[in-house]
A protein has these predicted regions:
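Short glycine/serine-rich loop segments
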Residues: 1-90, 97
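Amidase signature
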Residues: 92-178
Length: 178
């Protein structure tokens, strides 16, 4: 019982609402796990615990049976130990085959201005190495700009509004559960 501990460093947090799922995969307790992501809850725990977390496009994976937070922004996706396993599990969850060989010369947009000052030294070095390796895989890297001023405020208001509407009754009847 108690809080979930980070699989890499138990003195650190597991990274969010799907942290237990990420830790279970990282420690080999399970081969894969399902997470939900409204604002990073698949990707952040995956990054914190050294596993692969994939947030599929909105609507690709059904949320039937999941307890919603924000119907407009909720996603479900896999946490696995490899990209191949994430691809395979996403196919199962989506109920359709997703061909890998169909991608020719992908282009990666990288918002370097947005990332400036947000990455630690070691993460920045690893990310730079990745960007340098992509052209050898016939991928193009383009610097892009993400004008995100004000987007976060709108996003958080939407999520809070929808969460309040969805959970209003339960919050009134069982506040201790929140």
């Amino acid at each position: 019982t108690g809080p979930v501990r980070n699989a890499v460093d138990p003195s650190r947090q597991a990274g969010g609402s799907s942290g237990g799922s990420a830790v279970a995969v990282a420690l080999g307790i399970g081969l894969a796990s399902l997470g939900t992501d409204t604002g990073g809850s698949i990707r952040i725990p995956a990054g914190f615990n050294g596993v692969v977390g994939f947030k599929p496009s909105y609507g690709r994976v059904s949320l039937e049976g999941a307890l919603p937070l924000s119907r407009s922004t909720d996603h479900a996706g896999p946490l696995t130990r490899s990209v191949r396993d994430a691809h395979f599990l996403t196919e199962i969850l989506a109920g359709e085959s997703i061909p890998l060989e169909g991608v020719q010369n992908p282009v990666f947009g990288v918002p370097l201005d947005f990332l400036e000052g947000r990455l630690g030294v070691e993460v920045r070095k690893a990310f730079t190495r990745l960007l340098e390796d992509l052209p050898a895989l016939r991928a193009e890297v383009r610097e892009v700009s993400l004008p995100l001023e004000g987007v976060y405020e709108v996003y958080t208001r939407l999520v809070r509004y929808e969460a309040a509407r969805i959970h209003e009754k339960a919050l009134k009847e069982h506040p201790e559960g929140f």
